[in-house]
Amino acid sequence: MSTSVDLSSYRDQHFKGSRSEQERSLRDSTTLYVGNLSFYTTEEQIHELFSRCGDVRVIVMGLDKYKKTPCGFCFVEYYTRAEAEAAMRFVNGTRLDDRLIRVDWDAGFIEGRQYGRGKTGGQVRDEYRTDYDAGRGGYGKLLSQKIAPNTDNR
């Protein structure tokens, strides 16, 4: 029987190690990936929500790699696996800043992973988005670049 604390099918393609090492890291992890955050959600809001499930050791906000501004994800690390499992059960799919957030297991934060991996610096999922999402910067970044008005006055 599947529970909300089971591993999802997502695997970090940049993980340094074998598939079995990654699986083991995920099964032992106390770190969660939190996605679909508003760009305006604060670390304090995240802490308030996730601390309801246990003592939060650290929160690492996801940043646009060029602008160093929040880009809609973070990592939340707990002191124990049981606390992280409680967050997987009770926080995944809840609303924060009017958005349904996604929570998934993470193999553990490593410096550099706090930056978006998209070509424009943010998350890949925001580059090709064609819908308008005020909480995630408007239209997708690549679409915004195509429709941006010419400011050269030529």
Swiss-Prot record:
The record's annotation in Pfam families points to:
RRM_1
Q: Tell me which positions the record assigns to the signal sequence.
A: none
- In which compartments does the protein localize? Nucleus
Q: Where is this region: Disordered?
A: 1-23
Q: What does this protein do?
A: Component of the cap-binding complex (CBC), which binds co-transcriptionally to the 5' cap of pre-mRNAs and is involved in various processes such as pre-mRNA splicing and RNA-mediated gene silencing (RNAi). The CBC complex is involved in miRNA-mediated RNA interference via its interaction with Ars2 and is required for primary microRNAs (miRNAs) processing. Also involved in innate immunity via the short interfering RNAs (siRNAs) processing machinery by restricting the viral RNA production.
The Swiss-Prot or TrEMBL record describes its family as follows:
Belongs to the RRM NCBP2 family.
Q: According to the UniProt entry, which residue ranges have a biased composition of type Basic and acidic residues? A: 9-23
Tell me what this protein is called: Nuclear cap-binding protein subunit 2
Where, by residue number, does mRNA bind? 10, 33, 102-106, 113-117, 123-124
The primary location reported for this protein is nucleus
The entry lists its GO molecular-function terms as: RNA cap binding
Q: Which Gene3D superfamilies would you find in this protein's record? A: 3.30.70.330
Return the GO cellular component terms, semicolon-separated: nuclear cap binding complex; nucleus; presynaptic cytosol
RRM domain boundaries: 30-108
User: Quaternary structure?
Assistant: Component of the nuclear cap-binding complex (CBC), a heterodimer composed of Cbp80 and Cbp20 that interacts with m7GpppG-capped RNA. Interacts with Ars2.
Keywords of the record: mRNA processing, mRNA splicing, Nucleus, RNA-binding, RNA-mediated gene silencing
